[in-house]
Amino acid sequence: MIKLTQEEQKYLFDSIRIIPDFPKKGIIFRDITTLLNNKEALNFLLKHLKERYKDYNLDFIAGTESRGFIFASMICAKLNLPFVPIRKPGKLPFETFSCEYDLEYGSDKVELHKDAFKNIQNARVLLVDDLIATGGTAIASYELIQKAGAKCVEACFLMNLKDLNGANKLEKLTSVYSVLEI
């Protein structure tokens, strides 16, 4: 498995803006727009992910709304693979599978078109999002992929917020790769 060195990780981490107390006091927000706006860092990241996934024999890459769309679609372009969106409720126009997950105060839901994987049984799918925190969205997305008859071969995140344990929960279901462990 191809992973970055500590020096390479620092290079990418330094390209992400840190904003304390956003969106509310006590939260440290990691703003990826500065990475997206840095062509050298962005191309370095995409080259790394292309190298990592080029031999995975993937059929599709699924990205979760909304920042997961950004990275998933760019990886799709690098690997010449189709993109599958996993969206918030009511945003997809055709028949969907849905999966509900718990939030700190309440619940939310994600949806996937029933024919997203073109009825290819056991299609090999890479799940992509910008970060994993508690794991709720990622686990629900994994379950949607399974519900649609495909296989999530790995979940890839730009950042893993280690203290929130989401990656550990998801690793019970599928392989997890995080470019940056925070």
UniProtKB/Swiss-Prot annotation:
Return the CDD domains for the record. Answer: PRTases_typeI
Note whether Signal occurs among the keywords. Answer: no
What are the alphabetically sorted keywords of the record? Cytoplasm, Glycosyltransferase, Purine salvage, Transferase
**Chief location category:** cytoplasm
The alphabetized list of GO BP terms reads:
adenine salvage; AMP salvage; purine ribonucleoside salvage
Gene3D superfamilies the UniProt entry points to: 3.40.50.2020
The record's subcellular locations are: Cytoplasm
Ubl conjugation in keyword set: no
Could you name the Gene Ontology cellular component terms for this entry?
A: cytoplasm
Q: In which pathway does it act?
A: Purine metabolism; AMP biosynthesis via salvage pathway; AMP from adenine: step 1/1
Top-rank taxon, per record = Bacteria
Q: What class of enzyme is it?
A: transferase
What EC number(s) is this enzyme filed under? Answer: 2.4.2.7
Query: What is this enzyme's catalytic activity, as reactions?
Result: AMP + diphosphate = 5-phospho-alpha-D-ribose 1-diphosphate + adenine
GO function terms (MF aspect) = adenine binding; adenine phosphoribosyltransferase activity; AMP binding
Q: How does it assemble?
A: Homodimer.
Q: Which HAMAP family match?
A: Aden_phosphoribosyltr
Query: Could you say which protein family the record assigns here?
Result: Belongs to the purine/pyrimidine phosphoribosyltransferase family.
What is the recorded function of this protein according to its Swiss-Prot or TrEMBL entry? Catalyzes a salvage reaction resulting in the formation of AMP, that is energically less costly than de novo synthesis.
- PANTHER family attached here? ADENINE PHOSPHORIBOSYLTRANSFERASE
Mind telling me what this protein is named? Answer: Adenine phosphoribosyltransferase
* Species: Campylobacter jejuni subsp. jejuni serotype O:23/36 (strain 81-176)
Q: What is the lineage of its organism?
A: Bacteria, Pseudomonadati, Campylobacterota, Epsilonproteobacteria, Campylobacterales
Q: What would be the name of the gene that encodes this protein?
A: apt
